[in-house]
């Protein structure tokens, strides 16, 4: 009988073993950008015909915007880029081991590139940048007015990511294979859709978790084909209320109800049938919506004193980072959402997507 009594111990270990945190358990790939953020006025937005709450890619008419922003307003520089922000927040929430999170993207060989490398190292992220000298490191102007932020990304180097020159190299691809969860912001579909698909295929075939973000309304509008090519491989889709509405319109869902949109998105065709798709839409200070195969649930965000909110830029990225930090350990989805709300609540009290030394999440 003694043997039978001792049996539960090894069994318990078996359950916990696959959930142990380790290096490179989370993989992210995206556009590494240096954020140049400032509180601006309505005149500045109007001058460059910017919407208060939007994300766009810089065009010729925005050339002067970056210079004017630096000259006219008090600017702050922060290491940014949507995916990179999320990956850093996830690593911060995980704490140990360092380098639990991996990040790929393209930078220039310049001062801004050096800043991004230093900041990634300080955040204990295992960043492997593709470095090239044809284009300078990308920047993103974050024009803040009140609760809103208008983002204008000048991708530059970020746009030069090459699958065959970086992702396909054995030493880099090995890091993708080590990951249990992969996360890519939809923004990267404008740069290297073939890289996104390669990672998505790999995840689907090996029953890893592939997660994607709708990222901005223009992705659903102008990169619809790339987005829908990858959608069958998406296990978890993130987005905010504006992106969800645009996606629904582009897909002909004929509803403006966010819960209905989440439900219809959840039901889109899916490759890996072992994992049912989960759709998560944040709505700023309103409830976060989660659709699973069986139900749609609303989760209230944490109460926040409006006076404490300094900068909502990065809140969505932080939510994803918090969520992923628990997902890699196989925590329940409700815990993942709670961690996402926690991370976002910390980030909006600070400028840029920055955080204190240690999280206080229990």
From Swiss-Prot:
InterPro entries, per database record: Adenokinase, Carboh/pur_kinase_PfkB_CS, PfkB_dom, Ribokinase-like
Activity regulation behaviour: Activity is inhibited by 5-iodotubercidin and 5'-amino-5'-deoxyadenosine.
Impact upon substituting residue 30 to E: In HMAKD; the mutant shows some residual adenosine kinase activity
Residue numbers carrying Phosphotyrosine: 77
Record-annotated active site: 317
UniProt keyword terms in alphabetical order: Acetylation, ATP-binding, Cytoplasm, Disease variant, Kinase, Magnesium, Metal-binding, Nucleotide-binding, Nucleus, Phosphoprotein, Purine salvage, Transferase
UniProt source species: Homo sapiens
Class of this enzyme: transferase
GO cellular component, one term: nucleus
Assembly description: Monomer.
Comment on bound cofactor: Binds 3 Mg(2+) ions per subunit.
Motif (Nuclear localization signal): 8-16
Function of the molecule: Catalyzes the phosphorylation of the purine nucleoside adenosine at the 5' position in an ATP-dependent manner. Serves as a potential regulator of concentrations of extracellular adenosine and intracellular adenine nucleotides.
Cofactor(s) demanded: Mg(2+)
Record GO terms (molecular function): adenosine kinase activity; ATP binding; deoxyadenosine kinase activity; metal ion binding; RNA binding
Name assigned to this protein: Adenosine kinase
Gene: ADK
Tissue expression pattern: Widely expressed. Highest level in placenta, liver, muscle and kidney.
